[in-house]
Amino acid sequence: MDGKFACGRGRNGRIMRGNIVRSEEWVVMRYSSVLDLHTHTVASGHAYCSLREMAKVASEKGLEVLGVTEHAPGMPGTCHQYYFDNLRVVPREMYGIQLLLGSEVNILDARGTVDLPERTLERMDVVIASLHIPCMKPGSKLENTESYLNVMKNPYVNIIGHPDDGRYEIDYEALVQGAKEYGKVLELNNHSMEPDCNRQNAVENDREMLELCKKYQVPVVMDSDAHFDLLIGEFDLARNLLEKLDFPDELVLNRSVDAIRRYVNRKI
């Protein structure tokens, strides 16, 4: 039932949303979410809200965990490495929710080089690795795929961010099998599927990725990629695609804190 949602309460009483599934006797929620691990504040340079504003809205929307993953220094206009080195001074709980503070690092080449040093990465609560046009120009299908597979070897990288951008042609079979081998999570990025997003062919690429994740039992996480507080936890497009594919609920890590715990660097 695309586009229709149910509300229910998590263990802490907060409201969660998910797709409605009906039978003759009951209604259950599919793809409910207690977390959003990919968001940005003003520190990223092209986002519009403070950390407090983001945390407050996340709490009001019923999330239990908010990941704040500022763009790493290779992205024009973002914060310096010193920002990430100093995250130790920021509390990990605000407005009753847990914060995972980290970075969306930029993959810089086919070797999987990223733009923060290991001594900084090892202190991050969560690390997303992504391809961005200002930081790495699209290469061949092999080169683009190798960039993902090599960054997966980095022990501090947890999530592969928006691997759905058709400007970077990749081998999705290799991507999914690599995620399984290295224990990484593939992101289903809601923003990628929005009509005004610059990423190309995202829905079709996400569909292919999800079918392979289903085949090989590889987990995914829905993320908003919010650059404004009201977009936190907005996963309607991602949920609808999951529903169309009848994607297994147990492979969507948003369902509970327990589900995501082993995939992030700071234990929650």
Please name every model-derived segment.
Residues 26, 64-65, 77:
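Extended recognition/assembly regions associated with phosphoester-bond processing machinery
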Residues 30, 72, 77-188, 192, ...:
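Extended substrate/RNA-proximal surfaces in nucleic-acid metabolism proteins
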Residues 34-44, 68-71, 160-164, 224:
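Histidine-centered catalytic micro-motifs
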Residues 45-48, 78, 169-176, 196-212, ...:
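Histidine/acidic-residue-rich catalytic or RNA/ligand-binding cores of hydrolases
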Residues 52-66, 86-93:
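Alpha-helical scaffold segments that flank or form the walls of functional sites
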Residues 71, 218-232:
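Short acidic/histidine-rich active-site segments
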